[in-house]
Amino acid sequence: MGRKIKDFFKLNIVKGDIGLWMIYFLLCMVSIVTIYSASSQLTFKSERHWEPMVSQVGFLVVGFIIAVVLSKVPCKYFKLIPVVGLPLAFCLLVYVLVASKGVNDASRWISLFGISFQPSEIAKTMLIMAVAVVLSKLQKEEKIKTKKGTKIVVRATKGGYKKAFTIVGLLTFLICGAIAPENFSTAFMLFTVIVIMMFIGNVPVKLMMKGLTVLLVVRALFVTALLVLPVSTLQNFRRAATWKHRIEQKIGLEDVDKDSQKYKDDTRQVNMSKVAIASSNITGVGVGNSVTRDFLPHAESDFIYSIIIEETGVAGAVVVLLLFVMLLIRVGRVAQKCDRFFPAFLVVGLGLMMVMQAMVNMSVAVGLIPVTGQTLPLISHGGTSIILTSFNFGLILSVSRYAEGVVDKKGKAAKKIIEDEDTLLETDEIYSNVGMA
């Protein structure tokens, strides 16, 4: 079986790390099987039994083509993408704040030429790529002498970290600030990924702590304003009234009417998700035998992990979790192989974003954190998420192909040195024998 898989990759159809491709294919397979089972409500709305399934497979095929094409593009050209992509993404985010249409009670979507998509998905990738470019220019290698010999260390260029922090901070503020009004969870995750990238990129912790302190002060003032201002005033500011309602409920300032329709709607998803998990009885009810899918809102997207647990039990839950853990591990190995900073920062940022989104989705499904609306990458139903996740996979696979080339070159160079040394030893031995004669 393993040999057949290697033979498939030798067909030159796909390029890059085999492990990453296997994770990609397995996630797609889980998506197809689960969407077929979980999309009963979509099927009822469309009145066509196969429509949700066909659309999902169609998006996965398009995503696969994008991943294949990008995996064959040299990663050095990716630096050019955010030059155009980031300003475009910011403009789309501003547009969605002004003239967007609501989907699932959240105005996060825009429609262009009959295609609906979320600009925040594009903005995530563009910002990570831009930050990778900035941080890569900050790094430099220095040779230092130690007792064990010469050691190469990576440090920030003199004074460069302040410039990098300013640029990255400004870009992050603009993009996350534009995303937050309609999708706070995405803005928070993206901000967290950028902070981790800056930490890896040798930006001084003291400088980052100063920035975080300022943000915490702004956050405290913002929350205070939400609590003090009346609802009638906040209704003029998009979802501010909703945030006020949730904060007051969380800290116990607002009495919750459990008989109200709003309370029932807010808790229905969480309760039905718990019912789905409890119905699994550890071993699962079997693929396609879910009962909760007909009653759980957004079972095919936000709460698809609950359906996976219900049908496949603990085993299915662990397998999906391990796939994303393995993705993060493989991405880390690819970054370690890179001899240039930009591709290393790029794969780390994209990998962290995908895995963090998956962890948030799964945490919501099992009731660890409040509902966020985050989908499960490559598995949940949705075209924008699948296409852009595949785009990110393509970028990572291109870097993995570059990293493998670096390792091969180092291996060939080392082999040549060994061969040269063997030749010299043989020559010395010949001269030695001649001298002895």
Segment roles from a protein language model:
Residues 58-66, 311-328:
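Hydrophobic alpha-helical transmembrane segments
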Residues 61, 83-90, 164-177, 184-235:
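Hydrophobic alpha-helical segments of polytopic membrane proteins
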Residues 103, 107-109, 212-316, 341-343:
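Hydrophobic, glycine- and aromatic-enriched re-entrant/interface helices and adjoining loop segments
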Residues 159, 163, 167, 211, ...:
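Alpha-helical transmembrane segments of multi-pass membrane proteins, especially transporters
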Residues 188, 193-207, 291-316, 374-387:
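Interfacial segments of multi-pass membrane proteins
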Residues 226-227, 314, 318-321, 330-343, ...:
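Membrane-proximal intracellular helices of multi-pass ion channels
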Residues 332-373, 379:
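Loop-to-helix entry and N-terminal half of a specific, functionally important transmembrane alpha helix
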